[in-house]
Each structure stands twice: as structure tokens, then as C-alpha cells.
């Protein structure tokens, strides 16, 4: 049987503060992953992690979503839905840091959009 090489999963991180920098480092260390890049509204954070991990820096969420198959959402909790929904609408699968969001309504919205786009959403407990 012939061994087929699967393409690497194109990963990104939205929010590279304290926890997000660890997501970037871990993706960068996994053979099955290609850390494509990072986005953070704080330019200093995104440039620091981009330089440390040797990946691209994206100036907005839309650019990150276009480049990735999977994105870790590591923004402040009250922004999780605001960050996650557009990424899923771009076809990304997500790892969202705990907690998923701040309300039942936001959770229902995330679930609805995930189903519509056949996006996998996992809540991370790093």
C-alpha cells in the first residue's frame, strides 16, 4: 500500500496575548500543521509573535480567515462570537478558548453558523 502524504493543515491564531502566543508556538511545533500567521488588534503583540514563530502577520481578521483552514480564537471572551462567526463564514474550523462565549444567545448563534458552514468548533481548555 502506497503511503500518501497529507497536506499540512493551515493554522492561524486570532488573539496573540498571553494564551494566544502559546497556541501559535504549539501549532508551529506540530508536523501536521503549518502556522500560516497571526492576527491581533495590538500591533506590538502580532509583530512579536510573528517574529518569534516565523509566520505571517495579518492586519485584519478577514485576511487571516482567507489564509487558514483552522483558527484558534484566543481573544477576550466577550469578543469570541464576534471573531468566530466571520471566520466560520469564511469556511474555517475553530478552536475557541474557554469559555465559548458570554451568553446563551451567542452560543446559539455560534452553533447555528457552525452547522450552516459545516465548521468544526472545539472549546479549548489549555
Q: Which residue stretches match the model-derived regions?
A:
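N-terminal Rossmann-like dinucleotide-binding module
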Residues: 1-52
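Structural signature of beta-strand start/N-cap positions in the alpha/beta core
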Residues: 10, 34-35, 67-69, 93, ...
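Glycine- and other small-residue-rich loops at beta-strand/loop junctions that grip anionic moieties
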Residues: 16, 73, 99, 124-125
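Beta-loop-alpha module in the N-terminal Rossmann-like domain of NAD(P)-dependent dehydrogenases
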Residues: 55-113
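Rossmann-fold dehydrogenase core element
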Residues: 109-126
